[in-house]
Structures are given as C-alpha cells and as structure tokens.
Amino acid sequence: MARYPSVDTRRLFGYLAGYPFSPETLRQLKEQKVDLLHSHCPVMSTILARSIRDVVDAPLVFTYHTKFDVDVAKLLRGRLLQESALYVLASNISACDEVWVVSHGAGENLRSIGYQGDYQVMENGVDMPRGRVSEEAITAATTDYDLPEGVPVFLFVGRMMWYKGLRIILDALKLLQAGGQDFRMVFIGSGADAAEVQKYAKPLGSKCIFTGAISQRETLRAWYCRADLFLFPSSYDTNGLVVREAAACDLAAVLIDGSCAAEGVTDGVDGFLIDENAGSMAAKLQKICKRPECMAQVGCQAGDRLYLSWGDAVKRARERYGIVMENYRMGRYDDHHRPMDGVLNAQGSIMDALAKLRDLGDGLAERYREGWDEHREGIQERRDEFREEFQERLEEHREGRRAFRTELKQKGEALWQKLDRYL
C-alpha cells in the first residue's frame, strides 16, 4: 500500500482530497510490481493512476458510486462552471480502461454527466454477517431509550443531510402522529444538517430519538434487529449500503420507487416502495403498522433476496479483475487517452525531479551546516583553551606577586631588627 498526502477540503466536500503529484508516492508506485490499478475517485486518484499507468504497464479500473452532478451543483454557481467541471470528470473517467458502477441507476447518472463508454454493474457488499443478534445484545444497545413494547420502531442510519430524504421522513411522521398512530423514530448518524434536522423534528417530541453516530458494528446490528422498519427515502444514493445492512438483519426498508437504493426490490415482497413525497410515505406506514406480521415477513424476504456479503462482492471483483487483465494483455482497450497519460506522467516526473533537486539542495545545506558547526566548535574550543591558559598565567603572576611581597616584607623586618641593635 502506498499512501499519498492530502489537502484538507472538509469544509467544501466533507472529506480530504488527495494530492496526485506527490513525488514520494510516484517513486513508491513506480518501484512496485503493479498488476492492476483501481480508482474510486474521478479526480485526484484517477489522475495519479493515469500518470503511472504506462510506467507500471497495468490496466486502470474506475468505480463510480457517487452522484457527482449533485455535488458539483452544490459547490459551483453558474451553469458554465458546472458543465465545465462535469466535462473534466467525464473525460477523466473515459480515460480508464474499464468503468464499474454500483447500480444501474449509477450508470444512468454517469451517462447524464457526459460519459459515453461502456460500464459493468458491480454491486457493493456489506461487512455485516447475515442473521440477528441475541435479545441480550439488543437490550444492552437500546436499554437507555424509550422504546415501549408493541410500538413500531422506525430506523434511519446515515449522514444527517437533508438530501438523504430526511424531510420526507419527518413530514410523514407528523402526518402519522396527527392520525393518532404511535411510533418511535430513531436516527443514527451525524452530519452538517444535524442541528437543523433536530430542530425540524421538535414537534414530534419524545417520539423522535437521535443517537448520534455509532461506530461499533455490533451495536449497530442490534439497532437493525430492534427496529421494525428501515426508512430510506433517498434518491441521492447510488447503492444504499445501509439497505443491505438492514437486510442482513431481516429488516425491510421503505424506499423511493425508481431510486438506485430500490433496485431489485419488489413492493410488498422484499421491501416497500413509495413515491418521493411525505404523503405517500405516511400512507404506506399507516397501512404497514396495522399488519406487524407483514413487516417481519417482508424483512425475512429482504434478507434472502437482497443481502450481499462483502466476501461475495470481493469474489466477483477478483473474477472481473482477471478478465480486465486478460483484455489488457490482448490489447482490447482503447488507447486514445494515452498521450494525456504521458503529459500527466511528465508532470509527475517534473515534480520528482524538483523533489530530487530540493533533496540535493537540502543535502548541500546540511553539509554546509555541519561544516559551519564544526568550524564554530573549533573556534569555541580554541577560545576555551586560551581562556584556561590565560587564567593559569594570571594565577601564576598573582602567586609571584604574593611571594615577592612576602619576601620583601621579611627582608624589611630583618633590616629593622639589625637597625634596632645598633641604635
């Protein structure tokens, strides 16, 4: 593994952005035996991979799993800027040898930003094992919260961002509350909109619970097992891993019909589908709450039909990697973007050369500092030796003066004694 430095862009994007022209990273990667390059970022990581692709002689795979047109629209003002940014993204993705998407909807979104090539649908798996945790584990995780028996528990897990469909959830629950249906709604996660979401949920009172982020996977599993329904009305997500995490615990999800998260879900069989509005969700929840046995049955079907383990997903990826490397060896990939790869590689080489010059300069400066330090130490030693010699001679001179005064005094006293005898 070769790590490379990053730039703090959390205020803009919520995460760090890598710096693709790190000389040290380029040197490390060029020295390693690389069979295949796989990027999950259409900008920095892909630029880094392209800059070394010809040097390491390996194919480049890219996975698209975020609706970047939504992010670009939020970050950039002005249609021209947005279109230019999306063009750069699509061009960079098109330069990869093979493109993977995490859902058919993600592929359609990729097409909408200007990508015209082929792609492979490679679904993500989840690291949660299939099956429920013990009742003791559920009690330990949820005991501090007001969850009365017999009252439906709805669950959301994810970032506290409005684009996750949180307003639809809260508005639907307000309609449900107005209709006299009791419930508990549990939100697990954190995010930039958390404070606004909690304020918007105030009219629901104690029926709405915010736990904050939970990083312990077993605790999260316990919450999935305690809930009766998983609410995820997001049209932003391209795959919805949390839907499959819920399915791992036999928990059915309420999803937007036609969304990426709802791919492969059949209404009333292994999940519940609604239109993208609060009224549709409220009507669906009102109907489901009257049939609690239906929630459990559909949840089991979700586990059987939707669950995909991380191990199975990795196995599929490894099998596809073999096909990619074979296609690369046989020259089946288009190389019309290779000249630009050369430019990127040249940029990396320039950065590497500059780094070497900097290192050389640092080395010369270090040797100069060492020589100056030795010279300064020599001067200090000679100064100390002179001081010691001067002190010794000064002390000898003082001793001589004291001895002379003593001798002179003795001779004077002897002379006065002789004079006293004659006088």
Label for each model-derived stretch:
Residues 100, 147-174:
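Conserved donor-binding/catalytic core segment of Leloir-type glycosyltransferases
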Residues 105, 125:
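Carbohydrate-associated surface elements
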Residues 59-61, 69-91:
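Nucleotide-sugar donor phosphate/pyrophosphate-binding loop at the beta->alpha transition
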Residues 235:
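Aromatic "clamp/platform" in nucleotide-sugar-dependent glycosyltransferases that forms part
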Residues 195-214:
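Nucleotide-activated donor-binding/catalytic signature segment of Leloir-type glycosyltransferases, i.e.
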Residues 93, 213, 222-227:
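Short alpha-helical donor nucleotide-sugar binding micro-motif in glycosyltransferases
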Residues 267-268, 272-278, 287-292:
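Conserved acidic donor-binding segment of nucleotide-sugar-dependent glycosyltransferases
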Residues 252-256:
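Short hydrophobic beta-strand element within catalytic cores of glycosyltransferases
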